Amino acid sequence: MRVKETLNLGKTKFKMRGNLPVKEVERQNVWAENKVYEQRQKLNEGKPSFILHDGPPYANGDIHMGHALNKITKDFIVRYKSMNGFRAPYVPGWDTHGLPIEQKLKQAGYDRKKMTDNEFRELCRKYALEQVDRQRDEFKRLGVAGEWDNPYLTLKPEFEAAQVRVFGAFAKRHLIYRGQKPVFWSWSSESALAEAEVEYHDVTSPSAFYGEHVIDGKGVLDDDTYMVVWTTTPWTIPASEGITIDASFDYVVVQPAGENRKFVLAAELLDENAERFGWEDVQVLKTVKGAELENILCEHPFDNSRHLVTMLGDFVTLDSGTGLVHTAPGYGEDDYRIGKQYDLPIFAPVDDKGFLTAEAGDDFAGVFYDDANKIALDKLKAAGLLLKYMPYEHSYPFDWRTKKPIIFRATPQWFASVGDMRDEILKSMDDVEFFPEWGKKRLYNMIRDRGDWVISRQRVWGVPLPIFYAEDGTAIMDEVTINHVADLFGKYGSNVWFERDAKDLLPDGYTNEHSPNGTFTKETDIMDVWFDSGSSHQGVLAERSYLDYPADLYLEGSDQYRGWFNSSLITSVAVSGHAPYKQVLSQGFTLDNQGRKMSKSLGNTIAPADVIKQMGAEIVRMWVASVDTSSDVRVSMESFKQVADSYKKFRNTVRFMLGNTADFDPKANRVAYEDLASVDQYMETRLNEFVAETKDHYDHYDFLDIYKKLINFLTVDLSNFYLDIAKDIMYIDAEDSHSRRSMQTVFYDVLVALTKLFTPMLPHTTEEIWPFLKEPEEFAQLAEMPAVQNYANSDELMAQWTRFMDLRSNVLKALEEARDAKLIGKSLEAHLDLYVDDDTQAFLDHLNTNVRQMLMVSALDLHALSDAPEDAETFGDTLAIKVGHADGDVCDRCRMVKTDVGSDEAYPMLCARCAAIVRENYPESVTTGLEA
């Protein structure tokens, strides 16, 4: 018989390598076949609900790392809640209308103008559904659990019907109106945009400083005076209707040397502009307050038959420019507001494609707006009005879909009034909890400062605005017509709007005083896609009986403060008077390792599919837990490799414990807590702390803290201590000994707790572990989270072992120094002499543990501190340590150096402890003998 055969060496079929890219797919197929998600939902029937409402990603293209970050985080939460006492169904959704799909069809060669609207819409629908299928497979491959066979889609008839009813709630409160005012206009999309559809990029614009000739100075300014105006959009000068100044600013009338003309500009900006214009010996003729310049008239620089009025506004700054702002009410929100105040015309001579119209003048007609800048500058120069041209770098709005710059343009649009219910919206946020906390202020400020919502779009692929027009042009959107349209959409889908004439979309026998002849027409615009997704609280939460409205949680990227969080809040307050969510959690963007936005053009993208193919979805999931998602997250293959190392640590730790509990039956072999060895009670209590901390972090969505705690628990508590000292008990002591069963009890409890706690994060791996445990549930996902125990005297126990760990740290330091001095090789070769004070001696006695075994040395003697020799190393005033080489020979079984090796003649290579264990448990070895 060989010595090795007498050891309890761990054995398990749980593999060291997970082969995740292959095994994950197999495991997901098993879940699908066994309907594990559905089983979990059935188990949770009757429990309190927790509803995480999915913000719908756009159905176009493969998912990117931002999608993975978001969906996996949601999966953490839903899985945890489902295992922790809540009914937590997850309904994924998709945003399926909008311009990008139209553009994809255009790129594929389809010409919208050569087919009917319904033919084009059908192509859009098919494309959207293809993209949904594509992304659904990719999300499922990440291991995300949910109702993948019953998602919500904004193109489904029941959703469109609910959306129309949301519109009806606005209309009922008289919050829908038709107006002509500047909106974000995308010439590349030929449509108005909402603020949430705009992104900003740094650009260089042509900046012009020019004079506008005073023709009526109201007794304040002479006729030979020029107002110095600044603009970064010279192409808008044909639509200029005035000059805006600030009533409280000081303005100066100056005359530079060699100039016959006088100029007006802000006093505070005189010096920098004089230098800019090359003015010398500037004489200040007069200083006046802005209020004194109100209503002064100037000549339009391109049309002397038009007059420009000087107005007082609150948006003029002294940060740059001249303190006088060129104002075109048809081309800007501030301009529009002050133009309305002064009753100016709203003039925007530019068409849908960005080309100036004949109203802009002969020189500009048919010219693309950006090209018109040069014409405007040339005209200013020819008229002697241009004082300075210079490039100006600033942030400028772009269409987030086409990535092309946009313009402000006054066009007739439908608006939802935000201003009329702003206070109600802001008040509704009082009861909403935000993660991070600053999110509340961010959303509050956005709602406080935003304008009314332009909800009309001049496109085809979307939900039509359910508005009819009477014979005299009166817009009809009463409760009767809107509910009827909603019913039609619910039955036939929104295609019915394009298939039928207006009269066939109205209720039978419908009459309206504004159409005495019974003739009606219908609106051709569709709704903003943010109205689509923003209505999901009605189209999904209120529509499905097993969901709740308001939802417990909305979780999306931080860009959704101006997107989905924003639009959903507005629509919910309009419908119900309250927020659609109880909590809002926002995440940062995924960037490359240099902090740049990922894009195909930069070649810096890392797709989830690439990482999954190489390392597995578990690594992507663990990576999500390992990063601080409250701010922007940098992504690199190196970061995934680092996480893969942590995953390997988790897997190997589990494998070691599985191997050492293979012969453990929790029903037959479990040792009660009060009968556990002291060190095992300590680890059981430490595990209990870990469970409590981890569950608390789950409850507060602190996944990074969970990851950190896991790595610390695996490394510090288990690998560096407990699993290290365990080998002397697990391998050496008799298989059924109390000491071994005591430790196996803790091993098993650690395994079960780790498996349950990390099923939300690493479901593929924990389900691989689960069959090795003797638990009643078929799948880990069907188990409940471990309960936090209330052990007696746990505080005292933890205090004692914390003190022991401090002593152990000093011992490890002394052993390291002894190794460096070549006194010993391995720690097991050491003989320790510990010199302790009376209090430490009493503490060690009370600890009731084998101190030598806990310190992993072959021999240990305790002495009074007063007996410490001079060459002992002191640690504070309670401990001194002397390290020497243990006397005796190495036992072939426990590898300790013992003086009693060979004391049993039958086992000459074993120490007395090992000989006794072998003699009792392997009696045949007495006659056959042992071989090394």
Curated annotation (Swiss-Prot):
Its cofactor is Zn(2+). It is found in: Cytoplasm. Disulfide bonds: none annotated. Its EC number is 6.1.1.5. One of its GO terms (molecular function) is isoleucine-tRNA ligase activity. Keywords: Aminoacyl-tRNA synthetase, ATP-binding, Cytoplasm, Ligase, Metal-binding, Nucleotide-binding, Protein biosynthesis, Zinc. GO terms for biological process: isoleucyl-tRNA aminoacylation. L-isoleucyl-5'-AMP binds at residue 556. Belongs to the class-I aminoacyl-tRNA synthetase family. IleS type 1 subfamily. HAMAP family: Ile_tRNA_synth_type1. This is Isoleucine--tRNA ligase. The lineage of its organism: Bacteria, Bacillati, Bacillota, Bacilli, Lactobacillales.
